[in-house]
Structures are given as C-alpha cells and as structure tokens.
C-alpha cells in the first residue's frame, strides 16, 4: 500500500496537492488525526492501495517523538511518501487577505499575521521530517500540480481520459463537449440504398467512407489538431476531454469518424472511449 502524507502551512496549497492525488486514484482524507492513520490503513487494506491524508497544525501531537513513533509504526508493507508545502509569511498574509478565510490558529486576541508566524513555528519540526519540501510562494496551482505529479510519477503529465462521442444534430448537441466537429459536409452513406439501414460501425459503411479522400483528410486534420494541443491540455489539470462529432442523424458519418479517431489515439498513452449517442438510444 502506498501512503502519501501532505502537510504544510495553511494557505500553502495542501488542498491543491490533495486534488492532484485524488485525480491520480488516491483515496484522500483531509485533516485526519495521526493516531487514526493505522486503523484507516487496516480498514482500506485490499480495497484501496493508494491512500493520501493531509495533516495540519490542528491534528499534530504535542511532542515530536510521538509523531516519529506514529510514522514508524505503520502497517507492514506501507510505502510512505510525504510532502511539506510552505510559503513566505508575506504571501500567506496576502492569500488570506484576498480569500478572507479564517486561519486555523486565529483567535480573538491573535492577529492574522501572528497566527501565520505561530503556525510556522509549530510546524518547523514536522517540515524537517518530510521527504519533499515545496515552496509555493511563486507557484500557481498548475505549477504546484505539475511538481506533485513530477515527484510521484516522474512526469508532469497525467493520464487524460479522451472521450470521442458521435451524435446527430437533429437530436440536439451534447452539452459536455470540449471540442465539437460538424461532419455534415462529408459524403453521406444515407443516400446509398444498401447502406441506409446500416451504421458507421458496419464494414460496408466503413469501406464507403474510407474511399472518400475528403473523409480521410478531415480525420487526419482533427488528429493533427488534437496531437498538437493535447500536451498543453494535459498540463491544464484536465482529467477528461470530450470530442463530439456530429452529422445529421448520428448513424453513419459521425460514428465512423469517432471510431477512427478513437483507434488512432488508442496507443497506450491515453485512456480512450468511443460512445455513439444515437446508437445507444436506438438500443434502449
């Protein structure tokens, strides 16, 4: 089992790091008291091999040796990785002033600036025990996400799920599409009597469309467009990308084009799905 502990000063980006871990398949728990880590891992054994928890100043033991004992008494086979996120007092003060959130150590007689300094002092021993120290003072959320992925995966890229969806314009456009392409200008198998009752999944329709230079050129251009911009989309904290392909009825052209694109991107670099909305509705 892999366990990732994320700690750091409030406002330094712990929630961003947890979101990255969640996208990577980790079971995430926010602000779990350290004495409960062992029991949590025992309960998740066999069902979740990736676990991440965040620890802040409110759930730390008062003595450093207690923390060390808790981290060294984890269940056998636990692979531990830890992060400590920090920012300068000036940056943290600015972030809290902008969001107007209450600092965990803020009290009626303690100013925000004093609370920030106190937290830094309390967390200093913990910061010395963490595997990875990240100063987020000059990082935006995307740069921080990249650093966390780089440490865990050895790469800033994460697995992007690409969904190719065919649809018919006469049945309405899909609302969840990131890109939408209209293929109604392509040669239409509907006007071939023997092809009309078939779909873009059937071999005769596929052969008909594959013989059309315009169809092949269009597929190539969409593939080239997506290949060019996919690396940038992956670094923009995306988990899913939906490309909708539409023709008139959603039976022939859009189905074929979506299938061809799905095959071209099923090269092991991404998880690819092909969904045909109107064909699914017909089966239902």
Curated annotation (Swiss-Prot):
Residues annotated to bind GTP: 56-59
Binding site residues for ATP: 8-15
InterPro entries, alphabetized: P-loop_NTPase (IPR027417), RapZ-like (IPR005337), RapZ-like_N (IPR053930), RapZ_C (IPR053931)
Pfam annotation, one family: RapZ-like_N
Keyword Membrane on entry: no
Keywords: ATP-binding, GTP-binding, Nucleotide-binding
An example Gene Ontology molecular-function term: ATP binding
Function: Displays ATPase and GTPase activities.
Family to which the UniProt record says this protein belongs: Belongs to the RapZ-like family.
Protein name per the record: Nucleotide-binding protein Shewmr4_0670
């Amino acid at each position: 089992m892999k366990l990732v502990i994320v700690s750091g000063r409030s406002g330094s980006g712990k929630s961003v790091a947890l979101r990255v871990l969640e996208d990577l398949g980790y079971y995430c728990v926010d602000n779990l008291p350290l004495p409960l880590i062992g029991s949590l891992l025992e309960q998740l054994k066999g069902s979740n091999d990736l676990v991440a928890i965040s620890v802040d100043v409110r759930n730390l033991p008062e003595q450093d040796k207690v923390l060390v004992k808790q981290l060294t008494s984890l269940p056998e086979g636990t692979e531990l990785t830890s992060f400590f996120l920090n920012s300068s007092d000036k940056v943290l003060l600015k972030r809290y002033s902008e969001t107007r959130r209450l600092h965990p150590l803020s009290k009626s007689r303690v100013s925000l600036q004093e609370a920030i300094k106190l937290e830094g002092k309390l967390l200093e021993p913990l910061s010395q025990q963490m595997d990875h120290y990240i100063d987020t003072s000059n990082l935006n959320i995307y740069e921080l996400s990249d650093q966390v992925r780089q440490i865990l995966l050895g790469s800033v890229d994460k697995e992007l799920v690409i969904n190719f969806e065919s649809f018919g314009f006469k049945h309405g456009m899909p609302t969840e599409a990131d890109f939408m392409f209209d293929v109604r200008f392509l040669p239409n198998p509907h006007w071939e009597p023997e092809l009309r009752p078939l779909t873009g999944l059937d071999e005769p329709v596929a052969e008909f469309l594959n013989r059309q230079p315009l169809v092949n050129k269009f597929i190539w251009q969409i593939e080239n467009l997506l290949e060019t911009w996919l690396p940038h989309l992956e670094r923009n904290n995306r988990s899913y990308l939906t490309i909708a392909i539409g023709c008139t009825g959603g039976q022939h052209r859009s189905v074929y084009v979506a299938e061809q694109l799905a095959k071209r991107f099923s090269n092991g670099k991404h998880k690819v799905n092909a969904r045909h909305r109107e064909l699914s509705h017909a089966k239902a």
